[in-house]
């Protein structure tokens, strides 16, 4: 009795898994179609210019990110600068 019941449950799980795989494939195909359509529309209407205000903001933001990264690197480097680097010939 247990064997028959487990086989029935196994078939049910297999059916559910197949349905999910089919739904995932359909969603993936729809996403691809949307991306292709969006790329085609973008290429038709792209003026390829950005506003100077946006460019200035992006430039300031990138400088800020770089400055923070350099500061963070300097802090970490100063913490561990007293630890000597040991080279090893073992490879």
UniProtKB/Swiss-Prot annotation:
Subcellular location, record wording: Cell membrane
TM segment ranges: none
Residues with lipid group (N-myristoyl glycine): 2
InterPro entries, alphabetized: Small_membr_AKAP
Any one Gene Ontology molecular-function term assigned to this protein's record: protein kinase A regulatory subunit binding
One GO CC term, this protein: plasma membrane
Keyword Membrane: yes
Description of post-translational modifications: May be palmitoylated at Cys-3.
Keyword set, alphabetical order: Cell membrane, Lipoprotein, Membrane, Myristate, Palmitate
Protein family membership: Belongs to the small membrane AKAP family.
PANTHER family, A to Z: SMALL MEMBRANE A-KINASE ANCHOR PROTEIN
Function in brief: Binds to type I regulatory subunits of protein kinase A and may anchor/target them to the plasma membrane.
Protein name: Small membrane A-kinase anchor protein
């Amino acid at each position: 009795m247990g064997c028959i019941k487990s086989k029935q449950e196994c078939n049910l799980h297999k059916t559910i898994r197949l349905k999910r795989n089919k739904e995932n494939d359909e969603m993936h195909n729809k996403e691809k179609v949307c991306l292709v359509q969006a790329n085609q529309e973008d290429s038709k209407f792209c003026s390829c210019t950005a506003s100077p205000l946006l460019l200035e903001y992006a430039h300031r933001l990138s400088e800020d990110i770089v400055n923070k990264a350099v500061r963070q690197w300097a802090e970490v480097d100063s913490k561990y600068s007293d630890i000597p680097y040991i080279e090893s010939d073992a490879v």
